């Protein structure tokens, strides 16, 4: 399965949630996508379908392919603690996600591009792997003398919503990954236990 590059609103309408960005439009059009969306009722899903849907929602939210997502899940399962909560912590610890959370990029997709194009550093070293897993204490910044440094800096808009597991220095355009987040602090509406049940079959 290739990474989805189509309209973001279509994905959000499928799930009935603003999982890919701003959801103000949902108040105007929350119908399923398609020609007859307004006349279609959302089906009552069975157990397996609900589990699969939740996995797809998580993959679309964080922009992962199946292989990447399964690898992250397997790592979560190996760690001590609750597997579902570990999964969310690892997804949040991804470099591309953290660049997005800090407000350096307007979306996870844009954050992924910044990382891939070598504009992001971790502890002063360039890291161009979006899936790079941060550890508490890691400092995220922009590459010195980056060709797009000024344009990126000018586009940075610190988020009104603050996340207690990261800290952002607006003046230096640097962020610190303070700790792995507690599940209740992560705003995404993902029922991770359904994903655990799906992969446990």
Residue spans for each PLM region:
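Glycine- and Gly-Pro-enriched alpha-helical subdomains that act as flexible
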Residues: 118-121, 126-128
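Short, well-ordered loop/turn sites that connect or cap secondary structure elements
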Residues: 114-115, 134
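Beta-rich strand-turn-strand
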Residues: 105-108
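Ferredoxin-like alpha/beta domains used as RNA- or RNAP-binding modules
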Residues: 1-102, 129-201
